[in-house]
């Protein structure tokens, strides 16, 4: 059984995956293609934003729908401390005008986003849509004009933030979401010159290996 939240169907009978694509679309299509008995359930939420890109599925891909009307979960912006700001200062020295960046979640990426105010013509190819990105776009810092693909468009897989962010991405043609197999494909990422990835680390060993998913009991 696979269940995911979707928007109400449009006039053509397509629902939208909204705030998160990840592997939902490919899981549903792979289940259909396998020929095995699998149930696909869509939770229709009329408060789910509609986000463009490869983010649509026809109602025929689902076996059942259930209706719900509840607000999206909201997450406040992380407030970087002095240490995070100093680390971000070193990171910002490695980011140049016209670079395409990927941003993770956490205090350091948040500090980096805040420090990009002096840059211009930045592009975004990322898994997570950063919470501070709408400000960068409105100020002309992020234009996506120099990317070899999806010019003028921010490409991501999911977003988690506050209501202002959800209102921003809703039916906004400069934001497109795609499955993670597309945004996170190393071969696709490698075709972007001057690609910069900024993520948090939970631990680093003496050989320089970095762990970012778990550290002892912390995940």
Predicted feature descriptions by range:
Residues 1-218:
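Conserved alpha/beta enzyme-core scaffold
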